């Protein structure tokens, strides 16, 4: 909203009913001094790992939801690199059904390829119809350019986003650092990054 102001907020039955400067308190209202705090619409995290199913000793849908809400995030997008991978409608439905009971909005991506192997494309149509919000082989680069381009075209035809984790691991000995002054000072082999964009003209 491009609005940063000091305001009073009235909340009734858990709903914000009024925002204005210098509201007059009503009889019986509880008044909280929130000086120094920021009130904003719910935040959205577009890249979370709830590790559910399969790796729930790290995180699960419920604990991830609680952590998100505690940090002010009311919507999250979960990555598809679970065990099993979110490459089938059954796995996607299981996650989305269990997510319904949580108090935040949980969206789930599906994988681009079966088993994150970068070889055979998942059924984008069926997964989109079942509620996938996008496609990603998160953490696994799609090194086959033809396969990657075909996946991008399919996602575009469905008006769905595709998220890529594109680095050639053969060039990277320490993930997360690009070639430059810092990598030279540290003596870390790194690689320059290139931003690739495919589009229709």
Predicted regions and their residues:
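Active-site metal-binding motif and surrounding structural segment of the metallo-beta-lactamase
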Residues: 24-39
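Histidine/acidic-residue-rich catalytic or RNA/ligand-binding cores of hydrolases
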Residues: 88, 170-183
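Metal-associated gating/positioning segment near the N- to mid-region
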Residues: 37-99
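Conserved small/polar residues in nucleotide/adenosyl-binding loops
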Residues: 194-201
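Short, acidic/polar
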Residues: 58-65, 117-125
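Active-site mouth loops of central-metabolism enzymes
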Residues: 48-59, 109-118, 189-190
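Divalent metal-dependent hydrolysis catalytic cores, especially in the metallo-beta-lactamase
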Residues: 62-86, 100-114, 128-143, 159-163, ...
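N-terminal metal-binding scaffold of metallo-dependent hydrolase/deaminase domains
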Residues: 1-27, 200
């Amino acid at each position: 909203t491009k609005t940063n102001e000091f305001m009073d907020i009235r909340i009734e039955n858990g709903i914000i009913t009024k925002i204005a400067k210098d509201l007059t308190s009503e009889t019986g209202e509880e008044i909280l001094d929130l000086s120094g705090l920021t009130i904003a619409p719910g935040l959205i995290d577009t890249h979370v790992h709830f590790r559910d199913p399969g790796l729930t000793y790290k995180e699960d849908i419920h604990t991830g939801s609680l952590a998100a809400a505690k940090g002010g995030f009311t919507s999250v997008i979960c990555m598809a690199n679970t065990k099993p991978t979110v490459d089938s409608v059954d796995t996607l439905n299981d996650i989305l059904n269990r997510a319904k009971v949580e108090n935040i909005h949980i969206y789930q991506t599906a994988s681009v390829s079966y088993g994150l192997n970068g070889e055979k494309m998942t059924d984008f149509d069926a997964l989109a119809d079942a509620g996938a919000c996008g496609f990603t082989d998160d953490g696994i680069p799609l090194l086959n350019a033809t396969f990657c381009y075909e996946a991008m075209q399919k996602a575009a035809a469905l008006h769905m986003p595709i998220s890529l984790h594109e680095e050639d691991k053969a060039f990277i000995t320490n993930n997360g650092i690009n070639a430059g002054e810092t990598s030279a000072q540290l003596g870390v082999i790194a690689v320059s990054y290139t931003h690739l964009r495919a589009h229709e003209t």
